[in-house]
UniProtKB/Swiss-Prot annotation:
Keywords per UniProt: Ribonucleoprotein, Ribosomal protein
Ribonucleoprotein recorded as keyword: yes
Cellular component GO terms held in the UniProt record: ribonucleoprotein complex; ribosome
Annotated family: Belongs to the bacterial ribosomal protein bL28 family.
Organism, as annotated: Mycoplasmoides gallisepticum (strain R(low / passage 15 / clone 2))
Name of the featured protein: Large ribosomal subunit protein bL28
Pfam families xrefs: Ribosomal_L28 (PF00830)
Amino acid sequence: MARRDDLTGLGPLAGNNRSHALNITKRRWNLNLQKVKVKTDRGTLTVKVSARTIRTLRKLDLLA
């Protein structure tokens, strides 16, 4: 299962952890993905979107 927003295509971000001793290890910041139902002209569609996208969909009144 891909950790990707179905509407915006946004995926996880990569970066580094830094300890107090300044050691570096790679890490990922995953999206807060949720399954929501979106209104379309053909009915409703279930998509996996991030919490940020859900806020935008609510603002545009596109959630079912």
